[in-house]
From Swiss-Prot:
The gene is infB. Belongs to the TRAFAC class translation factor GTPase superfamily. Classic translation factor GTPase family. IF-2 subfamily. The keyword Transit peptide does not apply. This is Translation initiation factor IF-2. Residues 507-514 are annotated as: G1. GTP binds at residues 507-514, 557-561, 611-614. It comes from Corynebacterium glutamicum (strain R).
């Protein structure tokens, strides 16, 4: 396969300068650096078409004589397909040409004679005809033409000649522009109808590239002897007829190829010829690079005498079974029909017709022919060529960094992905992305988690659409990779069975939610809760009689304090029906509104329980009116929301409330699930029990959970070792809507994490590990503050940071406490950093971490275990214990405010006027002043004004004297002398004395 054409080669072919061609390529949108750059074939074709008009005119003028002259001497045309070659072999083959025989080297005449016949017949029509005029013009041309005819009939009398003539005729119809000038020393370009041979030889790319090699030698007659004994004008460095010996052996008498071409035709490099007079070396000359004198003797008389360019490899169809010679210097394979032995650098490759193709040379790489070395068997596909061509287009450069062009492609990245992840997606270098982002003003390392905005910014610069995958979508894709799905019942309608409703009790703090559940369960839970408020989700399943039918209902009790927003939202998502408890004596409160919004967001029907109607100040009608503003219109007002007036304390109308819940479940909801599938559920709460380990409160939503199942819950996994119901009794299996406490996980899952039964522990571990890694990346991206070059100085300044370690009795409480603390609004000079969080007692590990990071441990409903207390005392670690969440929030907020830098304000304490100035060699200028009001103190800060303009700020009173005695302060109405730190003073200057006083911060 020929090499790619270079810019300067194409410019010579088109007859223009390289500079003009570079300018045209740039106008056409092609990215080419210099004149030595290679050009893809499609671009070459476009340039040839662009300059086609001028090129065609030149070729026509040269083609007309070439076509006209061969028409008359028909025998010459047939004999001159290889102008010089047929004539010379004809001499030994036909006796009428003794001169040719004498001119040929001794002993070499018989071989070329035989070889010449297939060569003459094998000459392709297009290249052959242009050569005919060059042979016909000289007076001696007709004789060798006549002698050439018997030479054609050597291998196959008659037939070969007949086939050779039709093969030559097409050459006349498609004349070669330079065929005529060959004897006159003019250029010998390739046939105009063909594309130029593309190779590394800069002298062989155009039709006009071969003029100089045949200067002053004059036209070589078609029948003239080959310069075996006489000098050849242009081939001084070439022995014999190596090239033409191979060319003559192209086809045998039957038109088949005899020997492979020495160079481009077979894919291997051609031996270089000797130095040519005009600098144009014949690529296939017989100089002894890969061959020896044998090559010259093997085909001495086959040097072609015409000026035509030999055909390019593309024009010569390969003959089956003839492969390129592999060893350097060995002859090619012989022809198929009889004839002389194949000519090459060594012995001929066969006894058949045409000359055998010369062996591969030792490999002259570079400008003369194809590259040296082993032949390249593979060819680039169209896709590879297209990719290379596209890569040559103007690249995407950001700040000197070359980056790929996305061309609008969409890249999906997980939240918290790093630049290394981005680079893997687009096949780029992560270091290049880091440098590009630095040039855009962002400082990020390759492995650090990057915010969504930064990823999208970088993607836009590279023409990529970065799509940050939401955690839900990412988790769904993760499960799909394991052929798992969450949230859908398996099987058909026949597999579904009715399940109990899950009811969440929501409302404002102290409105009676837990007391209502106590009344329903006939238990007393609220009395055991700290501060009388619920600080976690409790799950209970009770059996109640509704209209003489026993029904099972699962209740979830959510906290009402504002810090437990996430718990209420989680409870709403895990439920079928929401019971909104509103105190009749208190009305609609902020958490009431929030609970309404959570229920509406989860598309959950609401039943309103107006509690505390037994109090004298209760006003149920007022509650109905207030809730109407939030879209909860009572049925008696024409709406669809059920309102029930109850008293949880007295137990009034509780049965009516339960009946309303069951009615809503039956009328509005189709509560069914498949109990036979693998269990799926949600962990509504989790905590670390000292004796039992991690314990998760789970509600099974579909399927049946059994002891021994392999489960994954969030980023934790394990096997169900034990299940306990709300009464502490062991259960072996839990069906849909059943709340149970599960033991056996390797850690404490997050509240609200999905629980899924998988095939084995291995799958569970893989899912949990991937979720854990994703969680860490997302947390790191969220907590990392973006640092740009503009705010680098402010970031490097010292800030006051309060480090906290949070420990709680369950995951929900820790989550609520963390979110509440992070919502505290503080100035930028004070930062809150939660370095660790966990469920369970305070351990020695927590104390060690706190001591190393100077952190405070917040223990919520837990105590220190073992020697943790002793270590905390020894290390000076502050451990704070709380049982009510809002007290922890208040103290942390106070601590943050105490860390703020004090605020100072200026307070004026006196004024003085300079009445006289004295000079003292030891101290300089002394100002004699009169204190007008207030006091003047030594070392106080002063402001000096002159004619109403401040001339000195923050000057100091270095020395103060009253009469001749040193004084600490001087009161109004007295004279004094003072030495100021500001020397440029004059009479009548005003001195204002002030001090900076710390003022308390506003709460």
């Amino acid at each position: 396969m020929p090499g790619k054409l270079r810019v300067h080669e194409l410019a010579k072919q088109l007859g223009i300068t390289s500079k003009e061609l570079l300018a045209t390529l740039k106008d056409k949108g092609e990215f080419v650096k210099t004149a030595s750059s290679t050009i893809e074939p499609p671009v070459v074709k476009r340039m040839q078409e662009h300059y086609g008009s001028s090129g065609s005119d030149k070729s026509d003028t040269a083609a007309k004589p070439a076509a006209a002259k061969p028409a008359a001497p028909k025998p010459a045309a047939s004999a001159a397909p290889k102008p010089g070659a047929p004539a010379k072999p004809a001499a030994p083959a036909a006796k009428p040409a003794p001169a040719a025989a004498s001119a040929a080297k001794p002993g070499a005449a018989p071989k070329p004679g035989v070889q010449a016949k297939p060569a003459a017949a094998a000459k392709p029509g297009a290249p052959a005809k242009p050569a005919a005029p060059s042979a016909a013009k000289p007076g001696s041309a007709p004789k060798p033409a006549a002698a050439a005819k018997p030479a054609f009939s050597g291998p196959t009398p008659g037939d070969a000649a007949k086939k050779a003539e039709p093969a030559a005729k097409p050459g006349a119809e498609a004349p070669r522009p330079d065929g005529m000038p060959r004897p006159m020393g003019k250029p010998a370009p390739k046939p105009g109808a063909r594309a130029p041979r593309v190779a590394n030889n800069p002298f062989s790319t155009g039709g006009g590239e071969r003029p100089a090699p045949r200067p002053g030698g004059g036209p070589r007659p078609g029948g003239g002897p080959r310069p075996g004994g006489g000098p050849r004008p242009q081939g001084q460095g070439r022995p014999g007829g190596q090239r033409d010996g191979q060319r003559d052996g192209q086809r045998d008498g039957q038109g088949n190829r005899g020997g492979q071409r020495q160079g481009a035709g077979a894919g291997g490099p051609r031996p270089q010829g000797g130095p040519r007079p005009q600098g144009g070396s014949r690529p296939q000359g017989g100089s002894a690079q890969g061959g020896s004198a044998k090559g010259a003797q093997g085909a001495p008389s086959q040097e072609r005498q015409g000026g035509g360019r030999r055909p390019s490899p593309a024009m010569m169809p390969p003959t089956p079974g003839q492969m390129p010679a592999k060893a350097p210097g060995k002859g090619g394979r012989g022809g198929q029909a009889g004839g002389g032995a194949g000519g090459g650098f060594n012995r001929g490759g066969g006894t058949g017709g045409g000359a055998g193709r010369g062996g591969r040379r030792g490999g002259t790489a570079g400008a003369f022919g194809r590259p040296g070395g082993a032949p390249r068997r593979g060819r680039k596909s169209k896709r590879q060529k297209r990719n290379e061509y596209e890569s040559m287009q103007a690249p995407n450069v950001i700040g000197g960094v070359r980056l790929p062009d996305g061309k609008g492609a969409t890249i999906r990245l997980a939240r918290g992905a790093s630049l290394a992840d981005f680079a893997d997606k687009i096949g780029a270098d992560a270091a290049a992305l880091v440098q590009a982002l630095f040039n855009l003003g962002e400082m990020v390392t390759a492995t650090a988690s990057v915010s969504d905005e930064t990823l999208q910014l970088l993607g836009e610069e590279m023409n990529y659409k970065v799509q940050v995958v939401s955690p839900e979508d990412e988790d769904r894709e993760l499960l799909e990779s394991f052929d798992l799905q969450f949230g859908e019942d398996e099987g058909g309608e026949a597999d579904l069975a009715k399940r109990p409703p899950v009811v969440t009790v929501m409302g404002h703090v102290d409105h009676g939610k837990t007391r209502l559940l106590d009344t329903i369960r006939k238990a007393n839970v609220g009395s055991d809760e700290a501060g009388g408020i619920t600080q976690g989700i409790g799950a209970y399943q009770v059996k109640v009689n509704v209209e003489d039918t026993e029904r099972t209902i699962t209740f979830l009790d959510t906290p009402g304090h504002e810090a437990f927003t996430a718990m209420r939202a989680r409870g709403a998502k895990s439920t079928d029906i929401a019971v909104l408890v509103v105190a009749a004596d208190d009305g609609v409160m902020p958490q009431t509104v929030e609970a309404i919004n959570h229920a509406k967001a989860a598309d959950v029907p609401i039943v309103v329980a107006v509690n505390k109607i037994d109090k004298p100040e209760a006003s149920p009608e007022k509650i109905r009116g207030q809730l109407t503003e939030y879209g909860l219109i009572p049925e008696e007002y024409g709406g669809d929301t059920i309102f029930v007036d109850i008293s949880a304390k007295q137990g009034l109308n509780i049965d009516e409330l339960l009946a309303s819940v069951c009615l809503t479940a039956d009328a509005e909801l189709d509560l069914v699930a498949n109990p036979e599938m693998d269990a799926q559920g949600v962990a509504i709460e989790a905590h670390l029990d000292r004796g039992r380990g991690p314990v998760a409160t789970v509600i099974v939503q579909r399927g049946t959970l059994r002891v021994g199942d392999s489960i994954v819950a969030g980023d934790t996994y394990g096997r169900v070792r034990r299940m306990v119901d709300e009464y502490g009794r062991d259960v072996e299996e839990a069906g849909p809507s059943r709340p149970v406490q599960v033991q056996g996980l390797n850690g404490v899952p997050g509240a609200g994490d999905n629980l899924l039964v998988v095939e084995d522990d291995r799958i569970a571990r893989q899912i949990a590990n991937q979720r854990n890694a994703r969680k860490r990346n997302a947390l790191a991206a969220r907590s990392r503050k973006r640092v740009s070059l503009e705010d680098l100085d402010s970031v490097l300044k010292e800030h006051s940071t309060l480090n906290l370690i949070l420990k709680g009795d369950n995951a929900g409480s820790v989550e609520a406490l963390e979110e509440a603390l992070l919502k505290i609004e503080m100035d930028d000079e004070v930062q809150l950093n939660i370095i660790d969080r966990g469920v369970g007692a305070v351990t020695q590990t927590n104390v060690t971490l706190a001591a190393a990071s100077d952190a405070v441990i917040i223990a919520f409903n837990v105590r220190a275990e073992g020697k943790a207390t002793e270590e905390a005392n020894a290390e000076g670690v502050d451990v704070r214990y709380y049982t009510i969440i809002y007290r922890a929030i208040e103290e942390v907020e106070a601590a943050l405010k105490g860390m703020l830098k004090p605020i100072y304000e200026e307070r004026v304490i006196g004024h003085a006027e300079i009445r006289a100035i004295f000079k003292a060699s030891s101290v300089g200028l002394i100002a004699g002043c009169m204190v007008e009001d207030g006091k003047v103190r030594r070392n106080a800060t002063v402001r000096i004004t002159r004619d109403g303009n401040v001339i000195a700020e923050n000057a100091k009173i270095v020395s103060l004297r009253r009469e001749k005695d040193d004084a600490t302060e001087v009161s109004a109405g007295y004279e004094c002398g003072m030495v100021l730190s500001y020397p440029d003073i004059s009479v009548d200057d005003k001195i204002e004395v002030y001090e900076m006083v710390e003022v308390p911060r506003e709460a």
